Amino acid sequence: MMSESNKQQAVNKLTEIVANFTAMISTRMPDDVVDKLKQLKDAETSSMGKIIYHTMFDNMQKAIDLNRPACQDTGEIMFFVKVGSRFPLLGELQSILKQAVEEATVKAPLRHNAVEIFDEVNTGKNTGSGVPWVTWDIIPDNDDAEIEVYMAGGGCTLPGRSKVLMPSEGYEGVVKFVFENISTLAVNACPPVLVGVGIATSVETAAVLSRKAILRPIGSRHPNPKAAELELRLEEGLNRLGIGPQGLTGNSSVMGASSRHAAGSCRSHL
């Protein structure tokens, strides 16, 4: 059992860690993203595509050198939290994450993206009603905490769609829906993009699973062979669209395609 003074110290420390990490990821791309972009850059054959990739890497380096966000749209912060029921700061974790976002907003600095919809007022802190959004997975009889941070930018979120499929549409319906959205909307989402596909018994669950799928390391595959094959075929097919970096045509369209699913009575929600 923690004393009140020790608990407050732990709260302050965890808040600082999450705030620093959130500020840091706005300036530095994950290693798997950088490695994949290098791979796509080396494989690019169009002169315009090569110029754009060169500009991307120049921008990423300047973000590190200047300690400033790599993109002006730092998005709304989302957390995916897997936490044990015996984690000592479970009761304080929601407020810790909120405070961490407000501190990261100043540290980075992050663009103020939290606007109270009906009041039409920007809170100026990247926090507000339902922001930061937190998705919880509570693990019984466990005292660990795993926190994943996702910056939901307006551009990269643009192709996000949900749809109820008829059971008879099957895998083909999933593929068709993904292609329709990427081919028409990804051009405005700063491609090459990461595609996350969630398949579940409700559109709400599918949407959450699609976000979680994006957090998987690039190049990793679903443990189910059929799902892994679906991911591979989506990636190969989408790249044949030739959307190219920043949508100006090129050899690739996506960095990868990942999927997650939940068991259900039919394959009808995406």
Curated annotation (Swiss-Prot):
Coiled coil: none annotated. It catalyses: (2R,3R)-tartrate = oxaloacetate + H2O. Disulfide bonds: none annotated. Pfam families: Fumerase. The keyword Disulfide bond does not apply. Residues 249-270 are annotated as: Disordered. This is L(+)-tartrate dehydratase subunit alpha.
